[in-house]
């Protein structure tokens, strides 16, 4: 329950979130200015909802989760932007990277899709395509790919979200099985076919075609 949280034990900066949905979080950057009543109203309303049904039943992984409140450390990047690397893995192998920057600043958010060799790919999600030839390759890219490879073992398709800090450390965000609940707009639409072509369903793709058994 929200009322069970001992805020005196939390640091000046922290994150509050619930475990059974996406985007249900509150960033607290100054506890002295924290609107506890507003946070309680939001969180208690989230706890009553089943995220699976909100998204048309597409996020089935949420359906049986017992709602909980989580307080986490507020991750900072030595005064710089916190880069978000969302690594799309298929059958335990990283294939596509979504790099997001300016996500937690007052600037406009930017996102880029790349392959694992850090070549930009000609598509985007929800926003028009933007290319940036000077997008710096992270020094710890191979380490992030290794982490994603390890965490994605045993899954047909999963997105592993990581943060890379200026000191070289890597922070785990989450694992996502249904990006944007499967209802996002790709630019161009042909990217849907490309992403779908990376999915291999054991026992289905290997099955003989009807009439050829």
Which role does the model predict for each range below?
Residues 146, 164-213:
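C-terminal active-site "lid" helix and adjoining low-complexity regulatory extension at the edge
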Residues 84-100, 111-114, 171-176:
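Beta-strand scaffold of nucleotide-dependent catalytic cores
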């Amino acid at each position: 329950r929200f009322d069970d949280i001992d805020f005196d034990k939390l640091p000046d900066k922290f994150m509050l979130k619930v475990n059974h949905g996406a985007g249900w979080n509150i960033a607290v950057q100054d506890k002295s200015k924290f609107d506890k009543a507003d946070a309680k109203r939001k969180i208690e309303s989230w706890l009553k909802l089943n995220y699976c049904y909100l998204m048309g039943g597409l996020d089935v992984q949420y359906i049986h989760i017992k709602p909980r409140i989580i307080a986490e450390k507020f991750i900072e990047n030595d005064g710089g932007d916190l880069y978000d690397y969302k690594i799309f893995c298929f059958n335990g192998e990283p294939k596509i990277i979504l790099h997001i920057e300016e996500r937690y600043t007052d600037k406009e958010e930017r996102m880029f899709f790349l392959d694992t060799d850090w070549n930009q790919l000609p598509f985007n999600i929800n926003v028009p395509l933007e290319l940036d030839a000077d997008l710096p390759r992270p020094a710890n890219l191979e380490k992030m790919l290794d982490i994603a490879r390890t965490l994605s073992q045993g899954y047909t398709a999963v997105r592993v979200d990581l943060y890379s800090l200026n000191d070289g450390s890597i922070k785990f965000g989450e694992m996502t099985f249904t990006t944007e609940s499967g209802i996002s707009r790709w630019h161009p639409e042909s990217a849907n076919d490309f992403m779908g072509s990376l999915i291999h369903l054991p026992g289905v793709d290997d099955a003989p075609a009807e009439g050829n058994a």
